[in-house]
Structure formats: C-alpha cells, structure tokens
C-alpha cells in the first residue's frame, strides 16, 4: 500500500523519531562528503501552483543528492492549467514518475491528487498544512534543545497552515504550544479540538507576551501569505502588536531560540535585531528542510 505525506499526522511518533534521526545522519554524511544514491532511477514530479524558493530548491537538491531526479512542473505549462481533471493528471503522472510533490492553493487538491494517484503524494504546502516545514522545525528544535518533550513553543502571529501543522505535531512530540493571534486570525477550532482530543497541550491566547513568557522557542511567520497581497495594509495594522522583537524575546526563557520558516518581511513580523541575533535558529531551520525532506523521500521511495 502506498504511503502519502499530506499531514504531519500521516506518521506515528515512532516514525517521526526515526525520520528525524535519519535526517540528522544524512546531514552529517553531507557535511563529510558522503552521498549514497539510494534513489537512483527514481523521479519526483513537483507541481507548483505557488512560487517557491526553499521548497523547490530543497526537493530538487535532495533528489539529486540521493541519486534521483526532480521535474519542476508549472500548472500553466501543463494540461492541468487548461482544465484537465486532477484525477486524470494523477493517473497519468503515476505512470511516469515515482512520487508527486505538490504546492497547492487548496488542500482539497492535494487530497484529490492522492486519492487517484498510485504513487506517494507529498504535501509541499496547502492552505491547511505545511507538514514538510514542521519536519524541519522539529529537527531544528532537537538540534538546539536536545529534546522536544516538554518544550514550550510560543507561536506569535497568524494561525496559518504552518501553525496548524505545528499544533498537530505536538501529538507526536510532546511539545506544548501556545498560540498568540488576533481573534480573527486564530487557528481553526477544528484543528485545536482535534489536537486536544488526541492529548496535545495547546492553548490559544490573544496576548503575545502571555504566550512568550517562559517559552523555550518563539516562532513566527509572515503576516502576508501568497494570495493575500490586497490585504497587506489591513493585516500589517492588525498584526503589528505581534511583532517578534527584543522586548518580546525578553519574556522568553534565557537561551530561548527564535524560528521563522521564511520568507521574512524584516521589521514587520520580526525585527532585524532578533532575526540576526545569536538566538536565531532560522538559517539552520531553512537548511534542515533539505535534510528532513531527503529522509522523507527515502522513507517513501527507497
């Protein structure tokens, strides 16, 4: 039976631990120049409905380093962009490539693609979740803090797709997450209810200081996701009290780290001072997309 990676909950706690351990091994092997072509003759088809820097580069480089090949597919250059049904695209691609990664506008598109594909489908981002990002985030937290169990994470800002995956990941990691968002932009009640029902430690507040107090990790993300450009002035006004700055970081534990999945709008959701500080794990976090996704690809295809 094929395996997909559409939600962070598509893997178990044990599978997550093994995947992160493998990612760290792959990272060390890359550092010393060891590359094993375990995915030789494998091809990853990558559909990008949204533009990308980190997702595209990390998956392309990852497949190359594992001995495989990645194809960049823009829907505008495919029949999918001219109205071909997703289910037909899924069936055809299943005959040509080994797996599909899609960066989609709508989560339903990812689900439909997976339902009709005979090969693994990876959610490279949707409007509901960004599970590949959370793999890298968990890896980064383990590297910096040497554990996830009991780690307190403060999410500051928009309760978006990355926030959703973070909340759901607490079921697998034992982390505690406190989300500080304006009420209008809080995470979906269905997400929070599901996480709580499964034993997660999640709390939603509106005060960023309350969330950051005693935090081991302070995380944020852009206030303006792709497709929201027309709301830029309104969103900036609403979210400015949620800026991650030195004053907010002073509420966190001594030695706390700050994370941002990028791209960052400097001096909006996070100040230059914090992003470029010793507390910043942002660049390791970005690099770890490569290693975590390589481990995921091996798990799905090797």
UniProtKB/Swiss-Prot annotation:
Its main location: cytoplasm. PROSITE patterns: CARBAMOYLTRANSFERASE. It is found in: Cytoplasm. Its EC number is 2.1.3.3. GO terms for biological process: arginine biosynthetic process via ornithine; citrulline biosynthetic process; L-arginine biosynthetic process. Pathway: Amino-acid biosynthesis; L-arginine biosynthesis; L-arginine from L-ornithine and carbamoyl phosphate: step 1/3. Transmembrane segments: none annotated. Gene3D superfamilies: Aspartate/ornithine carbamoyltransferase (3.40.50.1370). Pfam families: OTCace, OTCace_N. L-ornithine binds at residues 161, 221, 225-226. It comes from the Archaea. Disulfide bonds: none annotated. GO terms for cellular component: cytoplasm. The keyword Protein biosynthesis does not apply. The keyword Amino-acid biosynthesis applies. Keywords: Amino-acid biosynthesis, Arginine biosynthesis, Cytoplasm, Transferase. It catalyses: carbamoyl phosphate + L-ornithine = L-citrulline + phosphate + H(+). GO terms for molecular function: amino acid binding; ornithine carbamoyltransferase activity. Carbamoyl phosphate binds at residues 52-55, 79, 103, 130-133, 261-262, 289. It is an enzyme of class 2 (transferase). Reversibly catalyzes the transfer of the carbamoyl group from carbamoyl phosphate (CP) to the N(epsilon) atom of ornithine (ORN) to produce L-citrulline. Belongs to the aspartate/ornithine carbamoyltransferase superfamily. OTCase family. NCBIfam families: orni_carb_tr (TIGR00658), PRK00779.1 (NF001986). This is Ornithine carbamoyltransferase. The gene is argF.
